Amino acid sequence: LGTNPLTFGMPTDEPFPFMLDCATSIIQNGKIEYYARIGHDTPAGLVIARDGSTLTDSVQILKDIRSQKAALAPLGGLGELFAGYKGYGYATVVEILSAALQSGIYLKDLEGKDENGKIRPYHIGHFFIAIDTEAFMGSEAFKKTAGNILRELRNSQKAPGQDRIYTAGEKEYDVWMFRKDKGVPVTEAVQKEFIGLRDELGLTQFKFPFEK
């Protein structure tokens, strides 16, 4: 199974919608790639090896996943004790709905290679549901109720040491508001990747803004 994300978007009466976009695995490749770029280990328990051990070396994890020597743990964690069966079940639901409704490929066929190891095009299925809120209580009533729920959640009792409660999509909205004016930060590791790619393509006459 892949990360098989579940994504929900709902309008509210606030400046931003409720937006939940999450993998059915406990972590996704992009996060591990980020850890590798900044030289950090991946927290234990998020990636499992074939022998059942957990892996933490971010660079090695990426290699092992590509060679099918490692897998991402399901949402909830490893084993029944931490309810990993829930993430496994959610991932299976996405797999079925994305394949069975439109003859999409699934499981091992998603490797992008045929039985002889030859690269072939992906035929990935997707599954969408759109709900016309106007057909129920009306779009404005929906937005108001959704907004009230989010505000009540944010105003609920906070955990010790926490000064704020977020709802899904709120952090991303805050980041977008900041970066649309201030720009997107580029880590030193990514800068090196950009420079290496430019040099490899023979475009050394061009300079990046972060180069001195």
Sequence positions of predicted segments:
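Phosphate/diphosphate-binding glycine-rich loops and adjacent basic-rich segments that engage nucleotide
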Residues: 1-65
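Catalytic-core signal marking the mid-to-C-terminal active-site face
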Residues: 96, 101, 105-212
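Glycine-rich beta-alpha junction loops
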Residues: 24-27, 79, 133-135
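Generic structural "secondary-structure junction" signal
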Residues: 2-3, 10, 22, 34, ...
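Secondary-shell segments that build the walls of catalytic and ion/ligand-binding clefts
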Residues: 40-106
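Structural beta-strand/beta-sheet cores of well-ordered domains, especially the beta-sheet scaffolds
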Residues: 4-6, 16-18, 43-44, 71-73, ...
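Short conserved micro-motifs at the rims of enzyme active sites and ligand-binding pockets
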Residues: 31-33, 85-87, 139-142
